[in-house]
């Protein structure tokens, strides 16, 4: 294994990815690796690499790792130089201390009743302790980690529906569904409404507007609804657009004055603790903002900015991505105002369309915003047809 290359290993065992990232932030290790069952396919394992700051390695570095692995060019050492394996039992204690400190002294003015669906996530090794420290009354679901198979995407809607039913039945203040990696979450308010993806981000913006900071800014992807920027600017909070890639979001979150950053996929970065997606800390921040609002979350939700962005994906072979994106620029966007921060964003009479390539999968993403979801759906469907034609011609 890794020890045969002369590298020492700190074995954290079963641990949420945000805690691993926190461990890497300032304890001297040169990098980290996480192994997790793939959520899309049974029997596959995802291996993720992080640098010494706990940030996803760059795509260029990932390619060099693949090249070294395929050529078997890794270092080999003599038996007396083999790396050692260590354990660090206090990692959870250190994370918990930093977590509570980042939330602040006495962060909540009331005792929250919560329902948490852990989805068999390693978050169960630390989050119950944190919520107990915060004085929350919690009902837990799927808290055992011995499940043999990863949760499939098609199983999630039923889990969310069950969570919403339990939240309503128990008159809980809110419920949370944690994805197995501990980096993304879904929220259910006291009325049983499910908030996920861009909707979750809209709810957070409404909470921020209830008790806006004196200054600061929020980092959003280029395909976020324009209503988000307007809602934030009304309360004096700026908006910065950046790439949706995790590493780009992390770099943007490092800038001074950033309140939070998100790609609108359930991932939330709060620099108060660290510069990476952390569903555990995001949960705590939702509770803090809800406590400041001093009214039910369902009432806060009534002022959430509308989400009128529609998103579609189209299959696209990797070898065709470059040529198709060039054709989009030359044939679909040549006579219209456009920008290229991520993909090609084309201005339309009553909105915009964004065509971008997926970083990992053989897909293209098409986003469109218009005054209503119906108009946005029509706009995105029209561009899907045009891009499909370009794909056939490529």
What are these regions (language model features)?
Residues 1-2, 43-52, 126-128, 180-201, ...:
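Short Gly/Thr/Asp-enriched flexible loops that form oxyanion-binding sites at enzyme active sites
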Residues 43-170:
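Gly/Ser/Thr-enriched, mixed-charge loops and adjacent short helices
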Residues 3, 21, 66, 100, ...:
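Predominant activation on well-ordered alpha-helical scaffold segments within soluble catalytic domains
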Residues 24-27, 39-42, 105-109, 166-170, ...:
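Solvent-exposed alpha-helices and their adjacent loops that cap or buttress functional pockets
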Residues 1-44, 129-188:
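N-terminal small/polar loop signature for handling phosphorylated ligands or for N-terminal nucleophile
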Residues 173-174, 213-394:
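Phosphate-binding and adjacent anionic-ligand microenvironments
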Residues 12, 19, 63-97, 101, ...:
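Proline/glycine-rich low-complexity loops and linkers
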């Amino acid at each position: 294994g890794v020890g045969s290359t002369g590298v020492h290993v700190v074995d954290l065992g079963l641990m949420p990815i945000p805690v691993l990232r926190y461990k890497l932030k300032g304890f001297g290790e040169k990098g980290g690796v996480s192994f997790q069952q793939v959520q899309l396919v049974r029997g596959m394992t995802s291996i993720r690499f992080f640098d010494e700051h706990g940030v996803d390695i760059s795509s260029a570095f990932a390619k060099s790792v693949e090249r070294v692995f395929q050529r078997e060019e890794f270092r080999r050492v003599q038996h007396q130089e083999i790396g050692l394996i260590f354990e660090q039992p206090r990692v959870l204690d250190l994370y918990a201390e930093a977590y509570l400190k980042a939330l602040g002294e006495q962060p909540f003015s009331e005792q929250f009743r919560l329902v948490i669906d852990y989805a068999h996530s390693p978050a169960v090794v630390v989050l119950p302790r944190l919520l107990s420290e915060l004085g929350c009354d919690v009902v837990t679901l799927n808290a055992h980690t011995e499940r043999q198979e990863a949760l499939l995407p098609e199983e999630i809607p039923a889990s969310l529906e069950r969570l919403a039913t339990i939240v309503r039945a128990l008159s809980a203040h809110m419920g949370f569904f944690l994805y197995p990696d501990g980096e993304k979450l879904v929220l259910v308010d006291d009325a049983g409404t499910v908030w996920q993806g861009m909707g979750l981000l809209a709810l957070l913006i409404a909470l921020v507007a209830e008790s806006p900071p004196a200054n600061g800014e929020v980092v959003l992807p280029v395909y976020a609804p324009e209503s988000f920027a307007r809602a934030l600017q009304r309360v004096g909070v700026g908006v910065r657009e950046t790439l949706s890639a995790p590493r780009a979001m992390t770099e943007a979150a490092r800038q001074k004055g950033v309140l939070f950053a998100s790609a609108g996929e359930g991932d939330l970065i709060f620099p108060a603790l660290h510069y990476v997606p952390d569903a555990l800390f995001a949960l705590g921040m939702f509770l803090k903002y809800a406590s400041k609002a001093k009214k039910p979350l369902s009432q806060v939700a009534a002022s959430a900015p509308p989400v009128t962005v529609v998103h579609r994906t189209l299959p696209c072979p990797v070898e065709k991505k470059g040529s198709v994106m060039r054709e989009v620029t030359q044939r679909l966007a040549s006579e219209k105002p456009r920008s290229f921060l991520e993909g090609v964003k084309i201005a339309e009479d009553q909105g915009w369309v964004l065509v971008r390539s997926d970083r990992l999968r053989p897909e293209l993403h098409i986003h469109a915003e218009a005054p209503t979801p119906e108009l946005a759906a029509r706009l995105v469907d029209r561009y899907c047809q045009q891009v499909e034609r370009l794909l056939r011609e490529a």
